Amino acid sequence: MTCTFHAYEQLHAQPEVVAAVHTLLREVEQADGVAALGEAFLKGIDGDHGHQHIVAMTDERVVGVLALDGAVTASVSGENPTAELAVAPDVRRQGVARGMLAAAREDLGLTGPLDTWAHGDLAPARAMAEAANARRTRELHKMAVDASPGSDRGEQFRAGAEDAASKVESQGLTVLTYPEAVERFGEELVDEEWVRVNNEAFAWHPEQGGWDIDQLRSARDTAWFDPNGVLMVWSCGEDEDAAGPRCAGFHWTKIPTEEQEEPEGERAGEVYVVCLADEARGKGLGPAITMLGIGELMKRGVGTVELYVEGDNGPAVATYEGLGFGIVHTDVVYRGELN
């Protein structure tokens, strides 16, 4: 097989190549049962998000793509660039992945450590990591539970959501959807509070922490986003008038676009982001906010509830297992040298 490798600083400006890459990604997902690229990297293909790409082509089609998240900036700042890649199933183990990595060195000038996501940690990814002497540095579990209408688990979650609402109200807090909060407090304040709580909750997180309002709005700029699927818990009683309203936490739920077309009760929805402000910790609000969001997903026709949790967060994994969640698959970061 003759294969050529092309570097793109602005892949989104090449619509024919973008279309061919998406064809490849659909082929890979159908074969592997898991998407090769995550949401952020998909957005980096379709829009200007500072990503770089190596695309592997034969005369007939695109057979591989390597996506790099701000690689040059990361290298200059001393951080490790992060990558995700996909190779067509029928040309694996023929040097396509190695060729794309070599092109990243030669055409984009990348050297040093590279963190590469392997979604599902499938055998081809493990083989490539072993050949490159790469090591696991991070695991992210996808967990899911059947909460279909009429099931014991579904009824448990419905009751749990009602109890959670009572717990929140008993602490003098108010649950508002994002549009309700904007109507009451104004978009600027609500977005500032959203970012504040996010950054307090994810101060440790390599991707989710350190956001600004522009990053928040970019994250919301996606086809599946429903502002009514964001539940925010507010302290806004009379005793808070001097300081103004404060967000104690929020639960951002997600129902993917394709799932929205499924019949009610058969949709998959995600516990996408749950955050608690520092000042709200130690009051039992974290589990309550989580359950409020699960209840909202079920009201919107979700029968399978999904979430992602860090593999080294044993207490969280145990908590979700106690709620009936099981690990569906694990995404892994492998760190290897580009030199």
From Swiss-Prot:
Stored Pfam families: Acetyltransf_1, Acetyltransf_7
Record flagged with keyword Disulfide bond: no
SUPFAM superfamilies: Acyl-CoA N-acyltransferases (Nat)
Keyword Transferase: yes
EC identifiers of the protein: 2.3.1.189
Coiled-coil ranges (or none): none
Top-tier EC class: transferase
Span of the signal peptide: none
Amino acids binding acetyl-CoA 2: V274, C275, L276
Chain sites annotated for binding acetyl-CoA 1: L85, A86, V87
Biological processes per GO annotation: mycothiol biosynthetic process
Residue span, N-acetyltransferase domain: 8-174, 176-339
GO MF assignments: mycothiol synthase activity; protein-N-terminal-alanine acetyltransferase activity
Catalytic activity: 1D-myo-inositol 2-(L-cysteinylamino)-2-deoxy-alpha-D-glucopyranoside + acetyl-CoA = mycothiol + CoA + H(+)
Assigned keywords, A-Z: Acyltransferase, Repeat, Transferase
Sites where the protein binds 1D-myo-inositol 2-(L-cysteinylamino)-2-deoxy-alpha-D-glucopyranoside: E39, E207, K254, E270, Y308
InterPro entries: Acyl_CoA_acyltransferase, GNAT_dom, MshD_Acetyltransferase, Mycothiol_AcTrfase
Function per UniProt: Catalyzes the transfer of acetyl from acetyl-CoA to desacetylmycothiol (Cys-GlcN-Ins) to form mycothiol.
Quaternary data: Monomer.
The protein's name in its UniProt record: Mycothiol acetyltransferase
Annotated source species: Corynebacterium urealyticum (strain ATCC 43042 / DSM 7109)
Lineage: Bacteria, Bacillati, Actinomycetota, Actinomycetes, Mycobacteriales
